[in-house]
Amino acid sequence: MPAPQKDGPRANRDIRGVREVQLIDDTGQNRGVVPFFDALNLAEEVGLDLVEIAPNSVPPVCKLLDYGRFRFNEQKKQNEARKRQKTVEVKEIKLRPGIDKHDYDTKMKSVHRFFEEGDKVKVTLRFRGREMAHQDIGLRLLERVKSETAEIAKVESEPMLEGRQMIMILAPR
């Protein structure tokens, strides 16, 4: 059974099958192509680790540095990148065909706020009872929402009827 792979770059004696390496010292100076064991001895003399930076190049590029600090900084960078990553949520706004002007304006304020936050908006228009006979009213309402948000949003999914509700999905531009 092969040994488990370590995550991250190889260091010191973990670097195998290499006779010579392109060495970069702790000050960032390129020392050129050096025999592997000379580079390893130099790392031990200075009290640092020989870390393989570019394993696929010929010869591999190795650098003298503190491996523990290097791993810590890499982990810190990954955590920062994870924090900056924004998950896009889909917020839902529910409307009815007979919605009043003030209620409509309030819903539209919410829609604008969701777009400012970078979220997608699912506009759901629910029909009840005999309202199903007047789907054109619902379609006009969704077209009105689409035209009012045209500058700040794009339509990801056109209005379509699913059962007793008409759904449209908008995404911020």
UniProtKB/Swiss-Prot annotation:
Species annotation: Methylobacterium radiotolerans (strain ATCC 27329 / DSM 1819 / JCM 2831 / NBRC 15690 / NCIMB 10815 / 0-1)
Function: IF-3 binds to the 30S ribosomal subunit and shifts the equilibrium between 70S ribosomes and their 50S and 30S subunits in favor of the free subunits, thus enhancing the availability of 30S subunits on which protein synthesis initiation begins.
Domain of life: Bacteria
Claim: Cytoplasm is one of the keywords in the record: yes
Protein name according to UniProt: Translation initiation factor IF-3
GO molecular function list: ribosome binding; translation initiation factor activity
Family as reported in the entry's similarity comment: Belongs to the IF-3 family.
Biological processes per GO annotation: ribosome disassembly
One Gene Ontology cellular component: membrane
Record-linked SUPFAM superfamilies: Translation initiation factor IF3, C-terminal domain (SSF55200), Translation initiation factor IF3, N-terminal domain (SSF54364)
Keywords on record: Cytoplasm, Initiation factor, Protein biosynthesis
Pfam family, one: IF3_N
Subunit structure: Monomer.
NCBIfam families the UniProt entry points to: infC
Localization of this protein: Cytoplasm
